[in-house]
Amino acid sequence: NHKKIIFLANKVIFASGTIATTKIIIDFLNINKEIKIKHHQRLFSVFLARKPLKYNLDFTPSLLQIKSKSGKFCADLRPGNKLITESVIDAYPFYWPIKFLLNFTRDRMIFSNILLDSSHSNVFIKKIKDKFAIYSKKTNVKDYLIKYNKIIFNFLFDNKIIFPIFKTLYPGSGADYHYFGTIPFYSNGKLSVNEKCQLKNNKNIYIIDGSVFNFKLNKYPLGWVIANARRVGKLL
């Protein structure tokens, strides 16, 4: 109803997620420049297994993770399950006519989820005329994802796990939903925090979500965020 609520507090702790926190802090500091939102570019792949994979879980966790020595990418592999096939149909309704076929063959499907390091981030946020624009720019990142997917395919095929059939889907920049790194530790700009996660020049404001981290190599960083929140909680 366009109403403002004003309250006074000695300390304010933000743990509302990178996008929401970044919007609030940008607005608070009146920052108008473009801010890069770091994330892990993603590629989905599905392979056809030579043998059916039997399991009893409705949702099968990752059975195998493959990481490059340099940390440039990692991939997790898991068998198909009803939750995955239903999610595919929800996201891409044009697969509805073959829903029965997808569910019938899902025990021969191996799904791969490839994530790149944060150097390939391509999501930005900027405040323009009191509104926030979130956007991406033209990039050739899909070429890198396809290249690494070929490595996964060769590994599975050479070990006689799959047939030479696969399908890939690049959902676009930001579709990984691993957003972080907008308000990093010890940056020179106003958008930064100290070792106690206090906002620069505003030490009554604490930020404890993914905004403060650069998870360049760690593609599954939830544990780090939780551990840091507990650390800051003890300091308070």
Model-derived segments and spans:
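An active-site-proximal "capping" alpha-helix that borders the catalytic cofactor pocket
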Residues: F153, G223-L236
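Short, conserved micro-motifs enriched in small and acidic residues
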Residues: A15, K142-D143, K216-G223, A227
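Short, well-ordered alpha-helix to beta-strand connector turns
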Residues: L8-N10, N202-K203
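Mid-to-C-terminal "cap/lid" subdomains and adjacent gly/pro-rich loops that border
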Residues: K3, N10-S118
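C-terminal catalytic lobe of FAD-dependent flavoproteins
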Residues: P93-F163
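A glycine-rich dinucleotide-binding beta-alpha-beta segment and adjacent secondary-structure elements
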Residues: K147-K216, L222
